[in-house]
């Protein structure tokens, strides 16, 4: 059965939704203290993930659950030294890569402890997987939940838009979108799901603003 068929997000705690959401916000507060700027990236990733989920015709409640997974997808970064999180890929050691691979499972555990629905926690864990199967658990293509693939592309989208401008003086919004689209399409089929990438890239090409 294709993993593109979404399954409902089930709560692992019989608690009011507002209390659970507040606990999720506490995780983000801790992450922001650990690495300033993380909350902005979480919010941006969540916005792009929701837009992609709606564009791919997921049901509204499923799209909302994807947004929550995207919002919390990097809370496991609190277990990774900040100096490692800001290193460029070519500067990472083998130990650094192990920490970075483990952060998604760690983040899923933190989210589960905060009462986040089990299915959302699974999506957080799988959001570290690569479409080509070279991620932490070796899942590839449709073995990765569609929700996790959406989160991965949304994360890459927000990161690309936030990247420093290549020329002095910065770049216009149109130029940033063009650069982001190029980066997303270049990673499609290797790191990123091509279908999800195409959906978000098309939104950017049509002038969708940053969230």
What is the role of each PLM region?
Residues 15-211:
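Histidine- and acidic-residue-rich, metal-dependent catalytic cores
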Residues 1-22:
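Short, low-complexity N-terminal regulatory "tails/caps" that precede and couple sensory modules
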